[in-house]
């Protein structure tokens, strides 16, 4: 039986990506789309690429009848999601794409987001949505917290290595480049074409990026002790994609073997042959993450490079992957499309 889906906050980039993916899903149909500031408008007037997808018009959240909805995706901003989800029917399955439920400890949320959580009980119940590592818990979850796109990329590259003790836990560096869609659709001066094109810049320097909270939480959990990484994100003038280059101390061949073993049988994680490096071009529009390992012959370090699409595997695609599990569907349903090249 086809599952009925609501998307809350459908007028943002991740909401539109959910529409694109679910429009081609064999077992899901969208019955409600919300966008309070654009209520009453057809989705195709907001995103013309969705014309012909047969989507309902945008409405306000309070106008949605959730009685027949099997699962809701919440693509609202952080701090808004928690209050909205708290008010939803208690038996409604929810995949949240915001940052509101990623950190298990309310004190960690307050530290990184500058305010107390409005739904701490739900925060503690939420399952972290890094599918390949929380698959069993996600199947039985009522609320799944989508990962940060940067945090997901770094974890796919490093988590199996930390868990298996093949890298120095006290010397991990992540340099990451993200496309501009990662900053959202809101009008911001620094994202104007003339401000961003023909250049790139680092941001959230000095250990201030909020996704560090996810790295701290997840890496420390699998290591069994405190692990803190050095993380520097960069914003680049392309639309989609994340490329993370991770520098670690460890034997590169052993690192490659560990990643190959960890992801054997995983449909959406592809470990490239030793010495090869991935490109964001190859994963654009897909739910795949490509990982390469290279030995640095001068420093003795290993370089692990991971590429994914921040809107798909880094957010909406992974959200659909989690929803498939929560609804008892084939995990890969609606997600097997290849990228567009060139």
UniProtKB/Swiss-Prot annotation:
Disulfide bonds: none
Keyword ATP-binding among record annotations: no
List of catalytic residues: 149
The protein's annotated pathway: Amino-acid biosynthesis; L-arginine biosynthesis; N(2)-acetyl-L-ornithine from L-glutamate: step 3/4
UniProt entry keywords in alphabetical sequence: Amino-acid biosynthesis, Arginine biosynthesis, Cytoplasm, NADP, Oxidoreductase
Position of the signal peptide: none
Record keyword NADP present: yes
Enzymatic class: oxidoreductase
Example of a GO biological process term: L-arginine biosynthetic process
Gene Ontology CC, one term: cytoplasm
GO molecular function, one term: NAD binding
Pfam families: Semialdhyde_dh (PF01118), Semialdhyde_dhC_1 (PF22698)
Primary location class: cytoplasm
Localisation per UniProt entry: Cytoplasm
Catalytic activity, EC: 1.2.1.38
Enzymatic reactions: N-acetyl-L-glutamate 5-semialdehyde + phosphate + NADP(+) = N-acetyl-L-glutamyl 5-phosphate + NADPH + H(+)
SUPFAM superfamilies noted in UniProt: Glyceraldehyde-3-phosphate dehydrogenase-like, C-terminal domain, NAD(P)-binding Rossmann-fold domains
Family: Belongs to the NAGSA dehydrogenase family. Type 1 subfamily.
HAMAP family: ArgC_type1
Function: Catalyzes the NADPH-dependent reduction of N-acetyl-5-glutamyl phosphate to yield N-acetyl-L-glutamate 5-semialdehyde.
Name of the protein in its database record: N-acetyl-gamma-glutamyl-phosphate reductase
Protein encoded by which gene: argC
